[in-house]
């Protein structure tokens, strides 16, 4: 059976993405202060920050049904900028990204009770799909990036 793929609208992507971003900002993660969360852009290259970045060109509908319902995948990056001046700091730098993956897994097993999705969105999976890796190192600061993905069912017109 062939899988039919279509891109999500930017409006739907943002509507669902905002639910996930709001959930992440409320999480208690060691060494991550609420003020460190950024959306799309980091504001400094000298202080620790965690940034959520949309990947809208990879968000897509899978297998749309006759009444308009479909399964969708919504990928996003989380980038963590932190000091890498010591070997110990470098070893600990992926901890927040790994903790986020664990929190997402817990939320999934609890039927997404803490994330407020619109009524027509039925979340199925929220998981890390690409493990953290370093993307840059400059002036003792490094950025580690991991990719996560939400899979959900969008209800059709008569569901």
Predicted regions and their residues:
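Charged, amphipathic alpha-helical segments and their flanking helix caps
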Residues: 1-36, 58-159
């Amino acid at each position: 059976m062939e899988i039919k793929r279509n891109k999500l609208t930017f409006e739907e992507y943002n509507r669902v993405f905002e639910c996930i971003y709001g959930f992440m900002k409320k999480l208690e993660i060691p060494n991550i202060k609420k003020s460190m969360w950024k959306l799309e852009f980091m504001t400094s290259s000298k202080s620790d920050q965690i940034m959520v970045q949309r990947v809208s060109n990879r968000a897509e509908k899978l297998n749309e049904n006759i009444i308009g319902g479909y399964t969708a995948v919504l990928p996003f990056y989380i980038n963590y900028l932190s000091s890498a001046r010591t070997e110990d700091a470098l070893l600990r730098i992926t901890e927040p990204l790994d903790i986020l993956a664990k929190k997402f897994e817990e939320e999934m097993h609890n039927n997404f009770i803490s994330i407020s999705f619109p009524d027509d969105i039925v979340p199925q999976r929220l998981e890390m799909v690409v493990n953290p890796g370093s993307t840059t190192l400059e002036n003792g600061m490094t950025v580690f990036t991991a990719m996560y993905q939400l899979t959900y069912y969008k209800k059709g017109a008569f569901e």
